[in-house]
Amino acid sequence: MEEVTSQEAAESPRGHFQPLENQSECLSPELRFLQDTDMEQGFSGGFPISKPDGISEREQDLQVFDLESKNREVIRGDCSDGETREENKLLIPKRKISEEVHSYKVRVGKFKQDIAQVPETREVYKSEDRLERLQEILRKFLFLEREFRQITISKKTFSSEKNTEPEKSFSLDSTLDTDQRVLRIQTTDDSKYDMNFNQNPAVGEQEPINLTENFQSTDYKESLMDLSHLNKWESMPTTDRSYKCDTCGKTFHQASALTRHQRIHTREKPYKCKECEKSFSQSSSLSRHKRIHTREKSYKCEASDKSCDAPDKSCSQSSDVLQHKKGHAKAKSYKCGTCERVFSRSVHLTQHQRTHKDMSCKCTVCGSDFCHTSYLVEHQRLHHQEKSYEYDECGLAYVKQQGIRFQEKPYSCNECGKDFRLNSHLIQHQRIHTGEKLHECNECGKSFSQTSCLIQHHKMHRKEKSYEYNNYEESFSHSSDLTLQQEVPIRERVFDCDAWEENFSQRAHLIQHERVHTKEKPYECSELGETFSQVQASFNM
């Protein structure tokens, strides 16, 4: 038999009890029968008593405590013979582990007496049989006494490196109210089966613990009242446990998930943005939308190398930053083995490698090499003079659609050799040589070769001056005259006529005016031989 040293005892988990209140009720007949049966089988108070190695019998101290939901008490021994009431109590063994550990003092009282202090205690079980007996006692207690109002069901995988048998420990959780006690079982890393009764909330918080194996539900975590509820739950088919949508028949394990799904059919959008009044069906969608208004960018690209076009780029959504980070993984991953140039796509690398190799695209006419077929096709059009784009107005065709049409003047005058882009311009020009004047003035009978000249002539008859100068209340028949008048004020006209002392804003106007005095006519018509003082007069003939 191995002895438990004081050092091992000090390192072992501790179990503390909070003060319990007394209760005046006695044991029920079922509990009395259970207690008597257990005592005959070598149990004390419904729990197996196993003395660990190295601990003498005289160090055992039995304590009785009540597990009722409201009032509790601790007494030593059984109920008094003179008492007519039966105390509803269970006996739990408490043992002193080591002298180095602070000695415990249990205030034993009769009825209506609390526990002031309960020392550290630990019950060690080495055999599976004793553990199964303890589990049987716990199950009987659950059926007889409805003390445990809630049972947390879960399953965990047992693992141990020292022993091949699974390792389990028990704990009584008193962090809840007395009417909501939870019995839990958890896995441990110890090399022995440990039974810990921990009722002090201040001592180590533990994860939700497994109940005994017979109470475990392998599929779900549910809060059940007793074993009958668990059996009823296990007997239900999986389809009955889920939540089903009546519209599309889709099933969900949670009612909240079904509620969110049904908003797709009802088009309900209960979450509304206060700024733009846009509605959303889920709160997460509203949170993402609010980042647009606040310009919050919670997701940042932490890449600082040159491969990132925008270092420390921030995104408002995680999907955007993930897409951005993919660019770093794939950015410039294709490298040319000849010149070590790097490309982001394999197609670009293939096109670049053609420049190092023999040009695959070669012109059959002149022998020029090209790395792209599009360049070769464009080059061959020059040799074959292919004119793919035809101009509808004049019937001319061009290699390119834009830019070339205005560089060519296919219409030429036979008399003077002048070229024109449009046929209408050539016809208008030929009227100068032929002297044809189709446009005649109705008032004076004067004829003109162009309609623009006739319109200008009509303004002279009507003295129309549609362009008015607001500052000096003057009007002009031509917009160009108005523009010149606005640019140069009257007092700034520096060109004066010596004969009439008239001022002009431009030197050309002064020279033209002086011809009135000198009667000079420098413009001569080549056909009729007449001379004119102004260019416009020669065109108006």
Swiss-Prot record:
Pfam families for the chain: zf-C2H2 (PF00096)
ZnF (C2H2-type) intervals: 243-265, 271-293, 334-356, 361-383, 411-433, 439-461, 495-517
Main subcellular location: nucleus
Annotated PROSITE patterns: ZINC_FINGER_C2H2_1, ZINC_FINGER_C2H2_2
GO-annotated cellular components: cytoplasm; nucleolus; nucleus
UniProt xrefs under InterPro entries: Znf_C2H2_sf, Znf_C2H2_type
Cellular localisation: Nucleus
UniProt keyword annotation of Repeat present: yes
Keyword vocabulary terms for this entry: Metal-binding, Nucleus, Repeat, Zinc, Zinc-finger
Source species, domain of life: Eukaryota
Gene3D superfamilies per the UniProt record, alphabetical: Classic Zinc Finger
Stretches for region Disordered: 1-22
Family statement: Belongs to the krueppel C2H2-type zinc-finger protein family.
Known partners and oligomeric status: Interacts with VAV1 and CDK4. Interacts with INTS13; promoting association with the integrator complex.
Function, as annotated: Probable transcription factor.
The protein's name in its UniProt record: Zinc finger protein 655
Organism: Mus musculus
